[in-house]
Amino acid sequence: MKHRSEQTSQNPAGIKAKTRKAKVKQADKTPSAKKKLDRKTVIIIAAAGGTVLTLLLVFGIYYGIAAKGLKDDASALKASIKACASALKNGNASDADNAIIELDSTSSRMRQELADPKWNLPKIIPPVRQDLETAGMCLDIVDKSSGILLKPATEAVRDSGLPSEENVDLDNLGKETGMLFYVYADLIDNLSPALTEVMTDLDNLPKFHIGMLEDAVAKYRALPELTEQFNTLIRRAPDELLRPAADVMTDKPFDSLHKDDGIDTSVVIAYMDLGSTIRPFVVDINKQINEGTFLEDFPEQVKLAQKLDDISSYLDKLEHYKPLMQALIGDGENKMYLVVAQNSAELRACGGFPGSVGTATIKKGILKFGDFKTVYDVIPQKHGSSIKFSESEVTLFHKDWYVAKARSASANPDFPRCAEIWAAAYGRSHKTKPDGVISLTPHIIQRLMPITGPVTLSNGVTLDENYCIWYLQHDVYFEYFGNPKYKGKANDITDSLFAETANLVEDKLMSNPDMKSALGLLQVLEESSKDRVFMMWMKDEEGQKAIEDLGFSGALNSDPKAPEIGVYYSIKAANKLGPYVVLNTTVGEGKLNGDGTMTYPVAVELSNTMDEETLKFGRNNGYLTSTKYAGDMKSVIYFFAPAGGTIDSFQCDSKVKVKKTTYNDLEVGYASGFFVKPGQTVIFTYTVTTAPGVMAKPQVSTTPTLTEYADSTPTPQEENGE
């Protein structure tokens, strides 16, 4: 075969002709040469593209890792800012310094990272270049915030005189909290322009193209608008919230409430006045926060809203109780109140026999509680000379009982009248006439236990929020009346243990008072007034009106528009059968009458739950179950109609006769002298009709019993793990 060059040189024309013929044939049978070239080009480009994509992927991973490092540093920045803010909030300059050092260090490290030459290549891509520039702007904002906000704020806290390495407890309303509030107020006044400057820079910050970086700053983009929304309130805060609060906290810190073994009432009034002063501002800012559009983006704002809700609620309570406290404390004059502990084991219509009585006195502005003593040493049996009895009182509450003995005043469920009788009797045998009477049943002691914690009695028994009343009203009697060595002394011992418990709880409540315990006490009193566990009476008309407005009076129903059915029960005998009384009242559906009144069926079940074993024990220890009646409850029961209404159609499954009369313009049915034997239930049914035009279903007011505490047991003691 000849070489191609030789062929060409010998017959060039022939070769050209063949070539032309070949091209014609190829045109008829195969794709064009250009298309063949395109396919090759595609293959080459694809190969090259794959190489480029591989390179880009490698670079992307590399720079993605670098970007993630920036994101991690950004998270560290946020953590430092949060730590600094928390330290400043708690008045801890030392922790704030440490957080700022960490913040500045992280910012510097990020700047060095952004200046690294490795970023030169990706900078040729516009979005990456823009993100790197935006990251630098973020660091500018961080550095500016550190320089013109955080560092001046830290210096202000340090210069305030607060301990530099300790947190201020913002809940104790003490002098240090007041000092910190002064700092807050000055900072808001002085740093508002700097804050505006930082917010403007943040508002002008471009968005990141890299998603993970934008995610790190996205929620903070709302801060400028949020600050603008609250700008007016922020500027109001120093003079309408912080400085007024600081004035009170530094002048009358809440921890100065306890003074000379008593309560400094000027501190109480100061904080109530403060509540009235700052309440409008707190209401405004609370409303603004709850109506804001950023709650989902800022969990801190949710916490603040919840905190302000609590504060607003506290201030409402302070405002609510202020008239009562002013009436109780007065204008600096001396006051004295009886504090009566009604014994539910010896059940009476108003609560119980007044087994223990203490005093609350206010002298030179200091409130002190005297020790509880047995009623026999405090309230005489004879009535005060000012007490005169109506015919209905004699009929309902018995001449040989209520009328004859001042200590039996609780046979009348109308607490203002009962308290008036006790106060008059006390005044008869003492030089001082009480300004009022405060009534407590044992229930309140157990309700206070979550605030005070457990107490241990002199006999070694520990009482807590789960086991207290059942011991004092039930178990203690079996412990002492059932032991021969306490014969003749059991009654005095059990009464003294009850008084000891009351004194211990009172001491713990008053020994280290703070706002939380004070508000907790108010809440317990408010709840306990609803079921007649806590009641008050004052001889001063203005004070009594404040008590009535709060619902603390224990008075019988007097408002036809708020109808109330009264069911009250007494055991007319000396015994401790109260724990076995179950009193249930059910009000059925009402029926509209032609005259616009509503009639309701009512059923009352009265049970004696004493079992045979207890009865046997009681027979051997007569005072528990009544020596004379051996477990049978000698009963007196009252059914009061709602104000402006009527009561009728009495029936009883045990054929107990119910009579009718009136008391203070209220219709009342009553039955007395009947017995409820152990294990027996007596059912009364009747109807009540409300005043015309009153559609509200009547509520039930009744004597508080011990049913809810029945059979509660001591909390198991943890074993010593040594």
Regions found by a protein language model. Give the residues of each.
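Acidic, low-complexity/disordered segments
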Residues: 716-719
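N-terminal targeting leaders characterized by basic, low-complexity, disordered sequences
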Residues: 1-33
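Non-catalytic, solvent-exposed segments at the cell envelope interface
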Residues: 2-4, 21, 34-48, 59-710, ...
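Alpha-helical transmembrane segments and their juxtamembrane interface "caps"
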Residues: 50-53
